[in-house]
Amino acid sequence: MKAYLKSADGFFVLNKSTTIGKHADSDLVLQSADIDNHHALIEFNEAEGTFVLQDFNSRNGTFVNECHIQNVAVKLIPGDILRFGSAGMTYELVIENPSPVSCPWVRGPAPWPSPQPHLSSSPPDMPFHHGIQPATVQRSWSQGCPRPTMVPPAPHQRPMSASGKMFSFVMDPKSPVINQVWANAMDMSEQCMMDGLSGTIPPTEIFMDHDLSQQDKDEIILLLGREVNRLSDFEMESKYKDALIMNLQAEVADLSQRLSETAAVAAARQSNRCDPKLQGVDEGDDLRQKEIESMKSQINALQKGYSQVLSQTLAERNTEIESLKNEGENLKRDHAITSGMVTSLQKDMSARNEQVQQLQEEVNRLRIENREKEYQLEALSSRCSVMKEELRKEEAQKDRREAQEKELKLCRSQMQDMEKEVRKLREELKKNYMGQNIISKTLREKNKVEEKLQEDSRRKLLQLQEMGNRENLIKINLERAVGQLENFRNQVIKATFGKTKPFRDKPITDQQLIEKIIQVTEDNLSFQQRKWTLQRETHLHPKQEETMHSVEKLRVLLDKCQACMRDSCSSIDLKKEVELLQHLPLSPLVSGLQKTVVNILRVSLSWLEETEQLLGDLDIELSDSDKGFSLCLIYLLEHYKKIMSQSQDLQAQMNASRETQKSLRQEHLAEKEKLAEKLEQEEKLKAKIQQLTEEKAALEESIGQEKSRSEEALEKAQARVRELENHLASQKEALENSVAQEKRKMREMLEAERRKAQDLENQLTQQKEISENNTYEKLKMRDTLEKEKRKIQDLENRLTKQKEEIELKEQKENVLNNKLKDALVMVEDAQQMKTTESQRAETLALKLKETLAELETTKTKMILTDDRLKLQQQSMKALQDERESQKHGFEEEISEYKEQIKQHSQTIVSLEERLCQVTQYYQKIEGEITTLKNNDTGPKEEASQDLTAGPPLDSGDKEIACDHLIDDLLMAQKEILSQQEIIMKLRTDLGEAHSRMSDLRGELSEKQKMELERQVALVRQQSGELSMLKAKVAQTTGLMEKKDRELKVLREALRASQEKPRPHLSTEQKPRTLSQKCDISLQIEPAHPDSFSSFQEEQSFSDLGVKCKGSRHEETIQRQRKALSELRTRVRELEKANSCNHKDHVNESFLELRTLRMEKNVQKILLDAKPDLTTLARVEIRPPQNSPFNSGSTLVMEKSVKTDAGEALELSEKLYTDMIKTLGSLMNIKDMSSHTSLKHLSPKEREKVNHLRQKDLDLVFDKITQLKTRLQRKEELLKGYEQELEQLRHSKVSVQMYQTQVAKLEDDVHKEAEEKALLKEALERTEQQLSQERRFNRVFKQQKDRGEDPEQRNMSYSPFKDNEKQRRLFVEMVKSKMQNSSVQAGAKKATLKTGQERETKKEAYKSTQSLSFVKPGGKN
């Protein structure tokens, strides 16, 4: 009993004991990471006849039917799936002849007896080797059906394992459906014998036993029988198809016979019906008979063609079937030959397999013997040293080994030869397999061909059915046509003969009908001719008399008019005569002449009236004697000469006025320069006012200190204060009133000037933006207008071209009409000449074809041109409407702009007036200052007397002034905030206005553009004037600053003159020197100890911090706030601690200096961070002039003062260095060198450091300007890109318009092509109809010549009348053809897109019928 392990790589033969592992000595070597060196062992148990698998306690264990096993022995059954390790290959146990005792559930089905050829037999006893799939018979020989009912039953309990443990493995109870594997009679290929071999197995792994058993032979015979049955099925199918084809051929023949019979019956009926009509020469019946004959011929041709095609296809199918039969027989023969070859090859293979197995057994025996001999040699080698005789034995053994090795080499060479032969056999098998595949493909192709033939036969049957349906329809149409003809004939008889029949017994023939119609038409013609002659005779006599009388009247009046025109007459005389001419009662023939003469006279009358009006307008009175057109012209010439002389005088006056204007302009410029100087003075006054406000703010702190001092002084010396109170009160009131008035005036002026400046700046910005927008809009409008002009020019060119084409077409139509007239004349001449009728008729027909075609083309083109003209007119109207609407909109906008410009001019005028007022006010102030200077020398003595009373007075004044200034500052800040809100609102309004203006771009006309350009020029002039005014204002501010400096110098001189005679001057020199050294500039921020002042300072600093740029501006703001809070806390502590008067005074003076220094440092830092920020005002802070200073100050206080000053300097410098570092890091400036502190430096070094800091500031300014320029460039680039985008959008719109126009033109071209095709078809039809008419005319002529005598013809009617009738009928025919052709063209236009050609054919057929009904009247 042989067993195998089946895997994807092939088959492995199991020995009685097979070792599995990674080691090289193991039987089945598996080299993977999951497998141990000695993994497992499979042994055959002869007692039970089963295989047992034992795991050697491997790391990952083994899996039997996906059940994990480790250090356990398990019995195996055929079909068990094994896997060694967790991720190894799967193996299936396959046993050739399982023992029935040990494994009753694996028992296969009993072999089928011989008389059952169609059922599967028992599994064969074929020996398997590497590469063979050991499957059961149900797998190898099945044909797509599931296994029989004798497959293994439901799951069962496995027997006990070798180690005494029980393991149950579940089998799949469902029998799998096995696919068809058999392809040929051979059992050796990969698909014919095994169903489990993978596609990757090479064919070199197939081996067979030497002798086949009887079962195998029976199975092969059964398979061959199945193939024979399959081929017989194919034969039956082919016979069935042959029978079907024969039946179809018979049906086709029957159908063809029926068709021929029906056609013969229809022809007989039509001949029976048409015999009496042919005797009466009915042209319509002849046409129908011809059409029916043509249809018959077409049907016969189709039948013949169809029968021929059927016969050809049947013959081809017969030949194909015969060839297929022959091929099937050849295949059977080849199959028999190949089956014999396969059996012989199988026998050879089995014999060679047995030889190989014998050789393998011998090799195994030799291996065992070699092992035994090796053991013996080892024993001998141990004894070798002792006995020399054993050496001889070893030599003999060596000789034997060499002989054995030679034998092994021979065996190996034989094995190689056998393998080569096996490969050759496999190649032959492959070739046979390929041939069988080719044969199967050919069979499939033949099946496909048969299916196609069946489909063709079905299609042809359907076509035959359609042909039958068409014949039925044709029959129905013929019957309807016959009925319509009969009805039409009856109606004609009723119309000609009336209700009573002339021959009651006999039917009316066609000849009688035709003769009656001819008589009726002749009577009508004669009657109409008589009518015309009588009417002409009656109308001619009275008309001639009337015309003669009216002509005489006209002549008389015209002579009068001529006499009047020759004489010098006025317009009134001419008018009277024209009215007489107009109201003359004349005949209608002469009325046209009358109208033309009246029009000519009216033109001359209008000229005369206009000249008289001109003379009347010029106040030139004409006398009664002076009349006539020539005299009026002479008067006009004289007046013109007078006017020319007056115009020359006026030009001289204009030149003089221009010179005066130039002088006035120069004066105006001089006045403007004066105004500029005044503005400079105003600016100086502003600076002075700012200095005063700063002084007040600086003195507020000293005022608070002086309050406390004054209270102490009042307690000590109340008597002195009571005496001086009255004097102080009077002085206070006077000073307060004067200061309050000055403050109010200055505030109002400052506010007015600020507002003016802001308004001017806003107006300038608005005007600049408006001008930019206007220029941009103008450019856009120019582009759009140019495009519209081009379009209009294109349209005009097209219109002119179309007009030219229309004129050409009209000329062609006139030519064609002339040709038609000529053709009619030629027809009348041709009718007189009977011999040349046929030739001339043909020439006329050709000419008529050409004329008809040209007329139709011209008509269609005229219609198209009319439509286009209408569309263009509509588009032009729409464009005009749009332009008018745009004009109205632009006019409204222009009026708005004009109003704005007027408002701006009014504001400028008002500003100039205010400037004049301000200059006058400043002049008054200058006068007061000069008076004060003159009066300085006088009150020096009074000042020396009032020294004692001075300090308290000054302190009270300062307190009041500081309170007023604080209130003013608060009010100014509130007003500034409100103005900022207004400015933001105005900016939003400006943005909305810009958006509206951008919407209106591209909609302006040329006139509006011109107006906008004028307005832009005006705006530019105004902006230039404003810039000039600003320059003048700047000059005035410069002058004002100079005057402020002079005032400061004068005030210092006054103070010095007042302070010289005071006794305590020596004591006050030290703080003064200190204050003079620290001349500090800072913003107006009152250093009041109250909470309101601190809040105001914090708010101003926070505003500055928001404005400053950089990533670390918040940190700097926080640092500044902390420093200010520390300073304030220290100031308050010092104020509380120091109670003594002298100490208080010293500390307060020093604190003032320290706070001023700290604020100066803070201000410098803020200026470094944001130098563009505008400061409200700068003041010089000086120590209080009248504060008492004690000479007995101690050294301790001086030390404390020095330490405080050093701390303040350190804080300020830290803030400065931090700010410089942040700016340098943000701006990427590496050359910042002013990082040293000023604490321990000498004055010279401090100057150097200050110089370096200024350089750093210049670098920062340069960097900021560079960034600004870059931003401006980027903005300009963005604007350019936006303009390009808008241009692209406009170009896209124009491209879309052009595309639509191109599409329209293409549609027009297609329409013209379709119309040409329709016209060609109509021409072809008319040609056919004309040829038919010629034939009918010839037949009629022959019949008349045969049936009628020449005498009767001369008696019945004259040839001249016949010619007239023929001519009229011919014209009617031409008209009817034209109408029908136009109807057909319309119908084809509607149906060409849908592709329905049948309707057009039917219409053509109907048109021919209508023409045939008209034709009988036109016989010769």
Swiss-Prot record:
Biological processes, Gene Ontology terms: apoptotic process; cell differentiation; meiotic cell cycle; spermatogenesis
Superkingdom: Eukaryota
Ranges of compositional bias, category Basic and acidic residues: 1053-1071, 1340-1352, 1395-1405
Coiled coil: 241-495, 646-915, 1003-1060, 1111-1140, 1256-1335
InterPro entries: CC-FHA_domain, FHA_dom, SMAD_FHA_dom_sf
Gene Ontology annotations for the cellular component aspect, listed alphabetically: sperm flagellum
PANTHER family in UniProt: FORKHEAD-ASSOCIATED DOMAIN-CONTAINING PROTEIN 1, FORKHEAD-ASSOCIATED DOMAIN-CONTAINING PROTEIN 1-RELATED
Protein name per UniProt: Forkhead-associated domain-containing protein 1
Organism listed in the record: Mus musculus
